[in-house]
Amino acid sequence: MTADELVFFVNGKKVVEKNADPETTLLAYLRRKLGLRGTKLGCGEGGCGACTVMLSKYDRLQDKIIHFSANACLAPICTLHHVAVTTVEGIGSTKTRLHPVQERIAKSHGSQCGFCTPGIVMSMYTLLRNQPEPTVEEIEDAFQGNLCRCTGYRPILQGFRTFAKNGGCCGGNGNNPNCCMNQKKDHTVTLSPSLFNPEEFMPLDPTQEPIFPPELLRLKDVPPKQLRFEGERVTWIQASTLKELLDLKAQHPEAKLVVGNTEIGIEMKFKNQLFPMIICPAWIPELNAVEHGPEGISFGAACALSSVEKTLLEAVAKLPTQKTEVFRGVLEQLRWFAGKQVKSVASLGGNIITASPISDLNPVFMASGTKLTIVSRGTRRTVPMDHTFFPSYRKTLLGPEEILLSIEIPYSREDEFFSAFKQASRREDDIAKVTCGMRVLFQPGSMQVKELALCYGGMADRTISALKTTQKQLSKFWNEKLLQDVCAGLAEELSLSPDAPGGMIEFRRTLTLSFFFKFYLTVLKKLGKDSKDKCGKLDPTYTSATLLFQKDPPANIQLFQEVPNGQSKEDTVGRPLPHLAAAMQASGEAVYCDDIPRYENELFLRLVTSTRAHAKIKSIDVSEAQKVPGFVCFLSADDIPGSNETGLFNDETVFAKDTVTCVGHIIGAVVADTPEHAERAAHVVKVTYEDLPAIITIEDAIKNNSFYGSELKIEKGDLKKGFSEADNVVSGELYIGGQDHFYLETHCTIAIPKGEEGEMELFVSTQNAMKTQSFVAKMLGVPVNRILVRVKRMGGGFGGKETRSTLVSVAVALAAYKTGHPVRCMLDRNEDMLITGGRHPFLARYKVGFMKTGTIVALEVDHYSNAGNSRDLSHSIMERALFHMDNCYKIPNIRGTGRLCKTNLSSNTAFRGFGGPQALFIAENWMSEVAVTCGLPAEEVRWKNMYKEGDLTHFNQRLEGFSVPRCWDECLKSSQYYARKSEVDKFNKENCWKKRGLCIIPTKFGISFTVPFLNQAGALIHVYTDGSVLVSHGGTEMGQGLHTKMVQVASKALKIPISKIYISETSTNTVPNSSPTAASVSTDIYGQAVYEACQTILKRLEPFKKKNPDGSWEDWVMAAYQDRVSLSTTGFYRTPNLGYSFETNSGNAFHYFTYGVACSEVEIDCLTGDHKNLRTDIVMDVGSSLNPAIDIGQVEGAFVQGLGLFTLEELHYSPEGSLHTRGPSTYKIPAFGSIPTEFRVSLLRDCPNKKAIYASKAVGEPPLFLGASVFFAIKDAIRAARAQHTNNNTKELFRLDSPATPEKIRNACVDKFTTLCVTGAPGNCKPWSLRV
């Protein structure tokens, strides 16, 4: 049968595809076929929003054009017939004119690495196409499906709030009555000049937007016809009528029905499932109809969730409250269901038929008595969605030929009450741990239960109803007795086995009770004054437990020191200059590694990795892979011409030879003609193993004495004497989990063989061009000078591309060498997370001695890190941990030790902070325990033990310019700490089930590589005869603004405008032997190298300036050229006076320190473990800021990354060492709604740093630890909750490991519900996940 043509429009241009493949996504088509590379691949599963585009189509039922955002990574091109697609390139560019959305995110400093920026731009653009004057709330909601790892979100929201009709941001000028700064009474703030000026923004003119293609509009009256598209493996049929659909389903009962592809697409990509026949019913009128009937509202099964949401919101606004109880429950679930990109395309029927055991909506439909109409050819039936509808895992009552036609959501009745609840790791766009719908109907005029339905997701392999428990409550009265009976019944009926998938057994069981308690209280509250004698009364301190989460109006302040009066306007140092690439990033024009156009005859590589943690490789069978179309070759260790040894210590392999030592260990690689063929071929390579004993956890390693190297140790004073003199000694153990880098751009390399003398050029997303160059040369067996590595920019790095990027680069280089073709590989998100490792998990065993006054006299801490299957940077990371075990506190007698645990996990590596945050966290934990034990305020004990200017640290480095006391005082004052502490105490007395906590903590972070030889930098400057300057340096740009700062440095040094200076890329043939862009030192060392090069140029131009003092820069340059004076020079810098000895505990480990203080306030829900970040104040000493906008962006971004580390991000490993959390659906980084409602950052004034370029300081890593202020505020709130249930025992010490997830918070708030759900694991039980 002949395939149809696919017709759609992209940015106003008609596209006719004669060979549409159903397996091709819109993202792949845009990037490869149309060359529109502004739309990015971040995850491939619709979880990050980097691929967001706007889709527009004529809606026949509504008789209008509709615009909606969608994930291009999930959208099959076959769904786009007669649809108009708008990408970031289609709304504006730097070559023509930026769209106001693009301009505002760029000028408000909302783009750092820029990889997420096009997707965020398109989410905002789509909102404005639908709502030209949105509210602040609508703006925030528009980004539920977008993630950013760099900025901390504040500048994006603040820039886009200028579009809002209510509370539009004035950028800090204070001239807007709705200014976020005026919303809070705070007279302690001295306003700085604004980070941006909204008056410079172009106005939004909705009349200037591109029109919907007239050709598509002319087709609105043409009846749609059935379409058929034939791909390599899949046939796609677009049915146009219900009869066609039912006939097709009868002919192809095994066919999958797809509307939004948000589920099937995931199964095909990540579970390697193949569905040869797909039928799309999205056009069928009956499946899109909405009918308001006498018993409820009926929705066609293909209705998008966003349209369901809109309809229900309208109904709630119009109908009496009593009729809309169920609607409001559905809306509460939809509110947090997913981002708009998913809700706009995912169908209501698809969500039901998917039959997910953790569905947000199915428990609501089951509890409410929702009715489903099911049809097939010749049959039609209506069934209630009750406990029988899901007979088993992922199964429904539908027969093979049946389809779901419509869903009727009922009106609620008189005396009927309904609630829905969901708890996830993150509030926005997250899958549920437990979800539920709850309904009670009372006998008329009484509080006697007539019907009770409690339905849950996440408590079995399907959505279930607690029938045993509910049936016992019929005719009972709604009172405390019923509450106790239901809770006891649920605890017994809804049990989970200790090895249940998803883990978190006690947490999930407790949630079932907590949710019912909330429902019970909510019903009592609604009953209010009408409650009868037999109905319980609502305790006023319980009221807040019934409140649903509400977003408060945001308030953001950024304070910095303005430049001195008289500073030249051309001198941009100290000014809030936007990132120089921000406009290109916002328009999609900025080029990342995978954006480089394809080369002729380019091939694609896919890695083959181990599925065992520790095993011998018995055989590798590639026969099935060879059958895949486009297969070129399989590469193994036998194909390597040079050395298979790689890694910093030669303890790794390019490809595993005989043994694999972790799940994800690279065994080989498949090369093919397309990425899809390479992926398919890699999946069918068969490896057989002989398993060996594996060590997964830190505890396993300690037990088996499995370590790298010997113990590291720093010791000072007399520990024995210190402990003997102490009034109190507290000892304990603490664990801090790992963290994935989750840079939005995964690892990517393109290798181009040059064909002469082993030459090869590589484009790489790496922080370490030098190691990439040397590792590739070693693997190929050629001199390093034959390998050229080029880095334009990265879409984030955070340490994850310091060494682990070489894993991909050496494999791709080998493929290019073997085939003679250019070869490209960009890892999928799930591969990237599996293979490349992350932040080291730490276990600490500590003992601290202190006086009754809180003065610490002795400290001993043993640190253990999970290094993984190679040394990598683990030794240096442990060194830095030991250097930071004191934080800001003077401890006279101290000993710290460190061991690197050798385990069978992917090697852990550098991550922003580099061991510092782990040790600092441990320090603040024992510090808080000292305060609790002494019965003293924590802030008092911290202050009492704080270093003073000139003190020696435990590693005997003198503290110069110690500004923590200044930061501390300013933070106490600006945060109104003591007044708010009283308010927190008052809140906690008045609220039983919600508690608030407040914490202020300092940080001290050493600046330098701890390996002295790395503290060197080179720069190369070319001045051209037109006066333009090209700067090259050894540092790489990953969003931190390094190139921008280097241009500022050169501009100031040469006294020329920044417009004359350009940095193109980082390459090994311009600046060789460069240290990795890491340790926060790049601005310091490369800034000084650029400065030195500039001084050389100035010295050479000096004679010509003297000859022509009134001349211009161009005149002097031309005169020098004509006099044959070199206008090219290098600059070099080495950091002085470095070199610490562990043997003698002497010498400087660091050049200087960066300091800061943060105060955070949180509110926790004691019943669910949810928490809300209310406010954070940060005071940071960054010296004399080179660029306050970039530095504040680094402070906020680092803080939010730290907030993720300490409260949200959790890696789950199976007992066999396999990573469960391999993408944004299961691994949660902070989202837009995770940041503090009030977010205030102040750069300390008048604190120049004489040790760095233009008196500045490093800023990249130091603020990250301040995210722990949120963790300890949470712990403060938990302490209040525990005290309430333990007769006010405020001196209780309890362990809270990091991260403080909802599970840990809820389990720590011990109460009558948690005691009912204690679960003991049998000794032979294998848990779902391990703490590694």
From Swiss-Prot:
Disulfide feature: C535-C992
Residues annotated to bind Mo-molybdopterin: Q767, F798, R912, A1079
Entry GO MF terms: 2 iron, 2 sulfur cluster binding; FAD binding; flavin adenine dinucleotide binding; iron ion binding; molybdenum ion binding; molybdopterin cofactor binding; protein homodimerization activity; xanthine dehydrogenase activity
UniProt modification remark: Subject to partial proteolysis; this alters the enzyme from the dehydrogenase form (D) to the oxidase form (O).
2Fe-2S ferredoxin-type domain mapped to chain residues: 4-91
Binding site for [2Fe-2S] cluster 1: C43, C48, C51, C73
Manner of cofactor binding, per the entry note: Binds 2 [2Fe-2S] clusters per subunit.
Domain of life, per lineage: Eukaryota
Activity regulation (record text): Can be converted from the dehydrogenase form (D) to the oxidase form (O) irreversibly by proteolysis or reversibly through the oxidation of sulfhydryl groups.
Catalytic class of the enzyme: oxidoreductase
Needed cofactors: [2Fe-2S] cluster; FAD; Mo-molybdopterin
Start and end residues of each FAD-binding PCMH-type domain: 229-414
Active site: E1261
Tissue distribution: Detected in milk (at protein level).
Keyword set, alphabetical order: 2Fe-2S, Cytoplasm, Disulfide bond, FAD, Flavoprotein, Iron, Iron-sulfur, Metal-binding, Molybdenum, NAD, Oxidoreductase, Peroxisome, Secreted
Binding-site list for [2Fe-2S] cluster 2: C113, C116, C148, C150
Assembly: Homodimer. Interacts with BTN1A1.
Function of the protein: Key enzyme in purine degradation. Catalyzes the oxidation of hypoxanthine to xanthine. Catalyzes the oxidation of xanthine to uric acid. Contributes to the generation of reactive oxygen species.
Record family assignment: Belongs to the xanthine dehydrogenase family.
Full protein name: Xanthine dehydrogenase/oxidase
Species of provenance: Bos taurus
Source lineage: Eukaryota, Metazoa, Chordata, Craniata, Vertebrata
